[in-house]
Amino acid sequence: MSKRRLRAGLVGLGAMGRHHARVLKALDGVELIAGADPGGDPHGALGSVPRLPDVESLIALQPDYVVVACPTAFHESVALALAEAQIPALIEKPLAHDIPAARRVVEAFESRGLVAAVGHIERYNPALQSMRSRLEAGELGEVFQVATRRQGPFPNRIADVGVVKDLATHDLDLTGWVTGAQYRSVAAKTAHRSGRPHEDLVTVLGELDSGVIANHLVNWLSPLKERVSIVTGERGCFIADTLTADLTYFANGSTRTEWDAVSAFRGVSEGDMTRYAIPKREPLTVEHETFRDAVDGKADAGIVTLRQGLRAVMVAEAVLDSARSGETRPLALV
């Protein structure tokens, strides 16, 4: 918890901004001093907290930090204004609308030595945090594959990016995070089925530098809302459902056979299933606590760095480029 009461601001009061406002108003050690959005406060998220018309008005109040939850197209301009004013920022994902913009944001904050982070919220999901800890402890043995499914109905809140940058960035980031590896290459196909200008479906095949194969299915076309990550390894598989924050382990069975013809071709068999008991705190609250602590001087707070956010944008751009060209796109390792 913060040693002092930090004064926080918020830019963007839309579908995601309202949740940030709710958390900020209840966050220990933090006071939400104002929210800025030229479009008003359509969800009434601020309550009695003042609403301002723009980021410049918010900067004039000299907040200790600002949360950026405006549309992706404005992330760069808002972030650069905050960096110029020496104000730390928690920026919603994706970091920026393209790679050059993301690089400019990284440079602006790093060159000034400012605390800044990207809101890749899945890193704070208790199911994925538990999965990552267990993978690091070697409970699955060698990891072979990561497969994710993230689908649901079209969200009216999204207008300036497609499903790759809005949703698939979750899976692209979490895959590298839980495995501790980087994408070496990606191949992708996209579709436009809803009549909107951006893609609403993507399937991605990726290879990580560790040799792990990744598969991602993401769309805005399904009546079924699903958020599932499956990691398969030599001892079985973990399944994380980030909607319910449940983590389940399916162990490989060990069934002996004396039938040589079967034994020679036998693969894995189904073993025990374990559903872990995990404390289930809201990921957005944990994300805010983590950033608050970083602003307050905690060196190992566990924020998602801007460079990690830049990497997610780079992988997302490679996915879109592959879908356009029909070719597998390599990614430089960093």
Give the location of each predicted region.
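N-terminal Rossmann-like dinucleotide-binding module
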Residues: 1-47
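C-terminal helix-rich "cap/oligomerization" subdomain common to oxidoreductases
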Residues: 1-2, 65-67, 290-334
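Beta-loop-alpha module in the N-terminal Rossmann-like domain of NAD(P)-dependent dehydrogenases
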Residues: 20, 49-108
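Short, Asp-centered acidic motifs that coordinate Mg2+ and/or phosphate
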Residues: 34, 65, 145, 213
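A contiguous active-site-proximal alpha/beta segment in oxidoreductase catalytic domains
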Residues: 73, 96-158
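Hydrophobic residues in well-ordered beta-strands that form the structural core
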Residues: 91, 116-118, 240
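C-terminal glycine/acidic-rich active-site capping loop/insertion
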Residues: 121, 235-303, 307, 329
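Rossmann-like dinucleotide-binding domain that binds NAD(P)(H)
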Residues: 155-224, 228-230, 307
